[in-house]
Amino acid sequence: MGKLDLDWGLVKEARESAKKIAADAQVFIDAHSTVTVERTICRLLGIDGVDEFGVPLPNVIVDFIKDNGNISLGVAKYIGNAMIETKLQPQEIAEKVAKKELDITKMQWHDDFDIQLALKDITHSTVERIKANRKAREDYLEQFGGDKKGPYIYVIVATGNIYEDVTQAVAAARQGADVVAVIRTTGQSLLDFVPFGATTEGFGGTMATQENFRIMRKALDDVGVELGRYIRLCNYCSGLCMPEIAAMGALERLDMMLNDALYGILFRDINMKRTLVDQFFSRIINGFAGVIINTGEDNYLTTADAIEEAHTVLASQFINEQFALVAGLPEEQMGLGHAFEMEPGTENGFLLELAQAQMAREIFPKAPLKYMPPTKFMTGNIFKGHIQDALFNIVTITTGQKVHLLGMLTEAIHTPFMSDRALSIENARYIFNNLKDFGNDIEFKKGGIMNTRAQEVLKKAAELLKTIETMGIFKTIEKGVFGGVRRPIDGGKGLAGVFEKDNTYFNPFIPLMLGGDR
């Protein structure tokens, strides 16, 4: 029984609208692919490394086909055909193309059935590797006596140097962190390639590379065994390489991925057609790999008012839920985002925050909701900041938020020191323990401030979803409904990388992962 007396008929209507919005966009998504989707297929076929100029081989292959062949047939068809012709593996084919020793666009075409058969061993071996990673995660959790009950304490490291990040991450795990997110270097989401190898320089974060993923995964596994807890690793697959980074994460057993097309469109000016197509394949991969995705609704409240625009967050959560379901990603892996971002001077602001968080929990009961700390109104006064974080911590434990992005008392001053993290973890653990069953023991007053507020937000969200259903997601974004940010349908970065699929196009991984045995 919910605390908020929500109108469940209205919730159902909102879900139906969101379902239609996603289905409408899916028509476009199903008819198109992008250069990064094709590069992801290359990576999943075992193509890795760089050419003599440092260009990733997946980029070399896809660019070669784009310039010399017909990309609308899809990269899998070219690679499979070349495997039959040359008797070589995809990696060897890519290396020869890079050295200009092979032209895969000028070969005699074989039958589609034979091409798919040629790819079968390698596609199945990749899928088995991802399944083994998923099992390894489950085995660790079992070894440590099951998953953590209550919120995951989620912290961020961002030094630019992966080896320094390891030092910070291991310290955070020992201090009590459950999830470590390695922030990406500034602007990586705008690169149309994924850098290669271990990196030691970054700005505001560290490069997301497969080798960096491997280094951090090993460090967290080692400290996890020492502590008897499974420490989750999180990275970011928004931006122009969404599905590629999802694939790298699946291959290296990451546990969480920031993954939201709307975030990329609004806050990174990535073309909407491009990133919605990319999001679909990235979510199929994340769903199959057992990765929890985190969505970016919290960011709307950094550019728009958290009280007036709360309904846009809920509407976006409904839409993100439907986009995830279409990609085969279960509710248990949907870290739908929201945030504690109301102006601290607001009268009864805490009640409004509590109502919003409780509403998300009741409407998405199985989702490991991602709850963001106050950032917009942190002033650099560390004492007040610590109290703002304490109120945020109270909302999390009271309403059962799951992915708890730890607030930092030094927010708005500098990137956290290890000591800042220790104090913030101590604050959260104190509150989570002291108020452990508080949420179960209280009821909300009928007709009170919180009940009224939640019903109001739900009503506005349902109305907004009805409007979006009529307009479609593309027009809605053009009008600036989310976060007050307008983006044109043919503007932004990456549109040149979108293409319509030929009717013989195939992506061998979609049937294996979307309909596949988990």
Curated annotation (Swiss-Prot):
Subunit and partners: Heterotetramer of 2 alpha and 2 beta subunits.
MF terms (GO), sorted A to Z: cobalamin binding; D-lysine 5,6-aminomutase activity
One GO biological process term: L-lysine catabolic process to acetate
Cofactor annotation: adenosylcob(III)alamin; pyridoxal 5'-phosphate
EC number: 5.4.3.3
Pfam families for this protein: Lys-AminoMut_A
Binding residues annotated for pyridoxal 5'-phosphate, in chain numbering: R184, T185, T186, G187, Q188, S189, S238, Y263, R268, N299
InterPro entries: Cbl-dep_enz_cat, Lys-AminoMut_A, Lys-AminoMut_asu_sf
Membership in a protein family: Belongs to the KamD family.
Alphabetical UniProt keywords: Cobalamin, Cobalt, Isomerase, Pyridoxal phosphate
Pathway involvement of the protein, from the record: Amino-acid degradation; L-lysine degradation via acetate pathway
SUPFAM superfamilies per record: Cobalamin (vitamin B12)-dependent enzymes (SSF51703)
Catalysed reaction, written as an equation: (3S)-3,6-diaminohexanoate = (3S,5S)-3,5-diaminohexanoate; D-lysine = (2R,5S)-2,5-diaminohexanoate
Broad class of enzyme this protein falls into: isomerase
Protein name in UniProt: Lysine 5,6-aminomutase alpha subunit
Function: Catalyzes the migration of the L-beta-lysine and D-lysine epsilon amino group to the delta carbon to produce 3,5-diaminohexanoate and 2,5-diaminohexanoate, respectively.
